Amino acid sequence: MELLLLSNSTLPGKAWLEHALPLIAEQLQGRRSAVFIPFAGVTQTWDDYTAKTAAVLAPLGVSVTGIHSVVDPVAAIENAEIVIVGGGNTFQLLKQCRERGLLAPITDVVKRGALYIGWSAGANLACPTIRTTNDMPIVDPQGFDALNLFPLQINPHFTNALPEGHKGETREQRIRELLVVAPELTIIGLPEGNWITVSKGHATLGGPNTTYVFKAGEEAVPLEVGHRF
């Protein structure tokens, strides 16, 4: 399988997806036809989200079709060379994909060789479940099971920082709560600016910041760039 799982879409001082474009270009390998899954977008229309994505990827020679705009979305996915899943609200994303019967077709086409690109919520959707999202559950997705393209759980936008005076939980504390009730999980705290690529049977960590892996009953382990999962 070929996957590009990004923690986020924007870095300080850079345009939207600018940091991801070289990574995308490297994994295209001749692929040019993409379907875009915009369903995580809540405060922007799906048409606008699709147009924004298409404009960014046009210089790479990638044509983008919004999955919400086609008559037969399952067929569009089955014929896609690239599946792109944008960030936003993960619960809304999973709900729409489940209701439209898109989860199995996405899994199948990626396993057959299509490239999967997802950022934030799109990275969460590639995991076994969406239980490590940071998002508010604004809708009920009728279960948390997701695509299971990547075998570990990703927590995107990972940071353990707390504003001064804030009394809520740190991100690690929230991850530890999940590991109490689901100790079988391995959770990757993927900070902004980092990504995981899956190519030719290898999953590799990239990016400038320290990523952490969390397991039940163990201290968090820092992972360096180039780590293979």
From Swiss-Prot:
CDD domains: GAT1_Peptidase_E (cd03146). InterPro entries: Class_I_gatase-like, Peptidase_S51, Peptidase_S51_dipeptidase-E. Its main location: cytoplasm. Signal peptide: none annotated. It holds the Pfam family Peptidase_S51. It catalyses: Dipeptidase E catalyzes the hydrolysis of dipeptides Asp-|-Xaa. It does not act on peptides with N-terminal Glu, Asn or Gln, nor does it cleave isoaspartyl peptides. PANTHER family: ALPHA-ASPARTYL DIPEPTIDASE, PROTEASE S51 ALPHA-ASPARTYL DIPEPTIDASE. Keywords: Cytoplasm, Dipeptidase, Hydrolase, Protease, Serine protease. The gene is pepE. GO terms for molecular function: dipeptidase activity; serine-type peptidase activity. Belongs to the peptidase S51 family. GO terms for biological process: proteolysis. Its EC number is 3.4.13.21. It is found in: Cytoplasm. Hydrolyzes dipeptides containing N-terminal aspartate residues. May play a role in allowing the cell to use peptide aspartate to spare carbon otherwise required for the synthesis of the aspartate family of amino acids. One of its GO terms (cellular component) is cytoplasm. It is an enzyme of class 3 (hydrolase). The active site is at residues 120, 135, 157. The lineage of its organism: Bacteria, Pseudomonadati, Pseudomonadota, Gammaproteobacteria, Enterobacterales. This is Peptidase E. NCBIfam families: PRK05282.1. It comes from Escherichia coli O81 (strain ED1a).
